[in-house]
Amino acid sequence: MSAAAVDPVSATPMTGSKEMNLEEPKKMTREDWRKKKELEEQRKLGNAPAEVDEEGKDINPHIPQYISSVPWYIDPSKRPTLKHQRPQPEKQKQFSSSGEWYKRGVKENSITTKYRKGACENCGAMTHKRKDCFERPRRVGAKFTGTNIAPDEHIQPQLMFDYDGKRDRWNGYNPEEHMKIVEEYAKVDLAKRTLKAQKLQEELASGKLVEQANSPKHQWGEEEPNSQMEKDHNSEDEDEDKYADDIDMPGQNFDSKRRITVRNLRIREDIAKYLRNLDPNSAYYDPKTRAMRENPYANAGKNPDEVSYAGDNFVRYTGDTISMAQTQLFAWEAYDKGSEVHLQADPTKLELLYKSFKVKKEDFKEQQKESILEKYGGQEHLDAPPAELLLAQTEDYVEYSRHGTVIKGQERAVACSKYEEDVKINNHTHIWGSYWKEGRWGYKCCHSFFKYSYCTGEAGKESVNSEECIINDATGEEPVKKPQTLMELHQEKLKEEKKKKKKKKKHRKSSSDSDDDEERKQEKLKKALNAEEARLLHVKEIMQVDERKRPYNSIYETREPTEEEMEAYRMKRQRPDDPMASFLGQ
């Protein structure tokens, strides 16, 4: 009995040790402890390779032991690792991506025609049950009728964003929505242009523009300021001023004086500092403070006074910087000569001392100047006017006209252009740009459109004209017409109106033929109604037959229905939502 009682007790720890397969911690000897400490010191100094965890990453030897040691409940094998200090993947929250957003404008189309298992017994939708249905309870549910099944509601996704995702103001933005605003502004501009064109047409029809164009004062540019046309325009401008506030929209300014739409946009053509010189060895740009102290054009050989930006060092020489530097220099010189003053310790004392020094210095210069003039003379030379005023006036007589042209006297010098002028190359007798045709510039001497081509003279003109004639004959194109004057356009418009009046007279004669067309349409509609009734009867018979015994529609005719057939279909169609549907069926 005693042996039997001891065996199971002694067997229990043995089986437990086999299952755990763990070795008991052994006590380290003094030699092992010393070797371990030496190895740690070598790793800290970099003479020995660092420990590597199970993922192949190096473990920093400077990490304390209480951080790097693995607890027994995480890894009983006690392998070197820092996995227990890192965030565990199973505890990390899963956030939605930045591109996900709620769907808008989802169309709910009733596509299903058969009741589905698990759907709502009342309406037939799959997204809810009968007790959660918002539709009016039917007398006979969709489960038993199988008709008029409601569409499935669109369930929005449950989005969970992180800190940045919740504050992303552009998440879910659709750029196509902005096109609606663009179209609205385009319609407003089009309406304004049509109003302006209509007013011009009215003035043209009344003959005001023609009289103004043919008047001799208009040809010589001597128009009276208080003319009738200007009065009319001023009155129209006053009327437009009344409604300018109604026409004004955000982003626009309706200028009634000039009759144009002015965009309230600020044109900024400034260049970023780091884009002025793309050479990486040029001036250093600090992105944190957005400062570039040195001149970016220093290596380009440009004069700092000619460039628009020469670095931020100019700030050091603006404001009170120069005066403060002069005060500091005065403090150092005064301290060397025995005066105990300091810019930071005694700023008020130093400022008063420096002001008195400047006053005494100016008085000393004046006394020195007066003593020299008394001794040597020459005061009359100092009283002369400044050099800027010596050549400011002239006695040359010049007479101008009211247009600004010189009538008599010396003509003013023409402002020089920044481009090269009167440069004739490659044997040309005219400059580049002296000839223009069909949107292209060229040389007038040879009609050549290539800038660096050699001059061919009259032979080049003849060759260009012959090529144009050959191209026109081959393509059958007519030569470009000359632009018409306003008078010619007005005459063409009157001719078109006469043609329209003649067409209206012909249309009245053909009104008698329209009665016959109505009778034919009525006959076609009657035939289409009879055909539609026959089709509905055929469909009713087929629906009463079992679904598996219905015939195939393999030889069904597919063609576009006529207008009479569509009208008959609309007249015979039954609408279940119509309250008069039961009476119409009778």
From Swiss-Prot:
Motif (Bipartite nuclear localization signal): 129-169
Free-text domain note: The CCHC-type zinc finger is required to retain the protein within the nucleus and prevent its shuttle back to the cytoplasm via the CRM1 pathway.
Main location: nucleus
Cross-link (Glycyl lysine isopeptide (Lys-Gly) (interchain with G-Cter in SUMO2)): 349, 408
Record field: compositional bias (Basic residues): 498-509
Biased segments, Acidic residues type: 235-248
GO molecular function ontology, one term from the record: pre-mRNA 3'-splice site binding
GO cellular component, one term: cytosol
Keyword annotations of the record: Acetylation, Cytoplasm, Isopeptide bond, Metal-binding, mRNA processing, mRNA splicing, Nucleus, Phosphoprotein, Spliceosome, Ubl conjugation, Zinc, Zinc-finger
Modification sites for N-acetylserine: 2
Chain positions found as Phosphoserine: 215, 227, 235
Assembly information from the UniProt record: Component of pre-catalytic, catalytic and post-catalytic spliceosomes. Associates with the spliceosome prior to recognition of the 3'-splice site for step II, probably during catalysis of step I.
Family indicated by similarity: Belongs to the SLU7 family.
Pfam families: Slu7 (PF11708)
Species annotation: Rattus norvegicus (Rat)
Region (Disordered): 1-102, 206-254, 496-586
PANTHER family listed in its UniProt record: PRE-MRNA-SPLICING FACTOR SLU7 (PTHR12942:SF2), STEP II SPLICING FACTOR SLU7 (PTHR12942)
Name of the molecule in the record: Pre-mRNA-splicing factor SLU7
Lineage: Eukaryota, Metazoa, Chordata, Craniata, Vertebrata
Function, in words: Required for pre-mRNA splicing as component of the spliceosome. Participates in the second catalytic step of pre-mRNA splicing, when the free hydroxyl group of exon I attacks the 3'-splice site to generate spliced mRNA and the excised lariat intron. Required for holding exon 1 properly in the spliceosome and for correct AG identification when more than one possible AG exists in 3'-splicing site region. May be involved in the activation of proximal AG. Probably also involved in alternative splicing regulation.
Compositional bias per record (Basic and acidic residues), positions renumbered to this chain: 20-44, 519-550, 557-578
Subcellular location: Nucleus; Nucleus speckle; Cytoplasm
Biological process terms in GO annotation: alternative mRNA splicing, via spliceosome; cellular response to heat; intracellular protein transport; mRNA 3'-splice site recognition; RNA splicing; RNA splicing, via transesterification reactions
